[in-house]
Amino acid sequence: MKEISGIKVKVESGSKYTTDHGFHAVKDGIRNKKENAVHVRKPDWLKVQKQDSKEYLKVKSITKKHKLSTVCEEARCPNINECWSHGTATIMLMGSVCTRACKFCSVDTGNPKGWLDKDEPMNAAESVKLMGLEYVVLTSVDRDDLEDGGAGHYAATITAIKNLDENIKVEALTPDFAGINENIDKIINTKVDVIAQNIETVERLTHPVRDPRAGYWQTLNFLKYVKQKSPNVLTKTSIMVGLGETDEEIYKTMDDARSVGVDIITLGQYMQPTKHHLSVERFVTPQQFEEYRKVGLEKGFLEVASGPMVRSSYRADRVFKRNNLDL
């Protein structure tokens, strides 16, 4: 269901619809493709229990009131009940329609034609205050339709939160801003604590998995530039497993990330969001995820969050504190 002009309308996955702002988008980001209609039965360790607690409903109410999107909802994150029940959410900036169409992602795609909610930076800051967050994760859709990729809007949101309370820690999981350094600088020049850019998969699978405008080394060079310009800012990336990669390729990706100074890495199981998206090639066991974590720490990462249900922003506050995670 999509809420358009305040009315809930059923939009089929893979279908085109018109947004409240007058531009077209594709529901769940991928048009209907029968060849991907393969579903693999999930193992027991991936089953999640729904828990609509009072805190969950509070977070939902706050984000709706302030007209904010969350990646928790738009990307169908399996941890939404756990995180929202603990009063945390990952705010997704610049709307819920992405200009890119990665084959794993269920965020809607389209061309917003320059639309932005000018009130969003302050609305986001006020929501953070109402939720009582000490650590907030910001992410966004890609906005290739904007001259700076939305970097200025993103930076304004970070600044609004820090102006509200400079003690709030902010993690920015950003787009690659087309690899343009002056756009990246807009994020670096805020008081952001963590800058993340997800590599998503191993180098061999980058083209079939990610949008053609994204790139394996474009992501790594982004993170390298951040670390060179601001050594005190923690850098972070994330890998999905289960797309057809080998363990050796995962370890090579870890090496590549460490070579550009990445501090934190997360690894989680890819789960096919709709029948039109890439199929799951394998389900990795919790034991193997623990092995990934062990290897990652040996390679020098300050922290490795690795588990079937881990996503890039999952328990981000705990990862920031560099605790050993019981995942």
UniProtKB/Swiss-Prot annotation:
Where does it localize?
Cytoplasm
Enzyme superclass (EC): transferase
In Swiss-Prot or TrEMBL terms, this protein is called Lipoyl synthase
Gene for this protein? lipA
Q: Which organism is it from?
A: Francisella tularensis subsp. tularensis (strain SCHU S4 / Schu 4)
Task: Look up keyword Transferase and say if it applies.
Answer: yes
Q: Which family does it belong to?
A: Belongs to the radical SAM superfamily. Lipoyl synthase family.
Relay the cofactor remark from the entry: Binds 2 [4Fe-4S] clusters per subunit. One cluster is coordinated with 3 cysteines and an exchangeable S-adenosyl-L-methionine.
Xref: HAMAP family: Lipoyl_synth
Q: Which cofactor does it need?
A: [4Fe-4S] cluster
PROSITE patterns xref list: RADICAL_SAM
The record's SUPFAM superfamilies line, in alphabetical order, gives: Radical SAM enzymes
Recorded metabolic or biological pathway in which this protein acts = Protein modification; protein lipoylation via endogenous pathway; protein N(6)-(lipoyl)lysine from octanoyl-[acyl-carrier-protein]: step 2/2
Entry GO terms, CC: cytoplasm
Predominant localisation class: cytoplasm
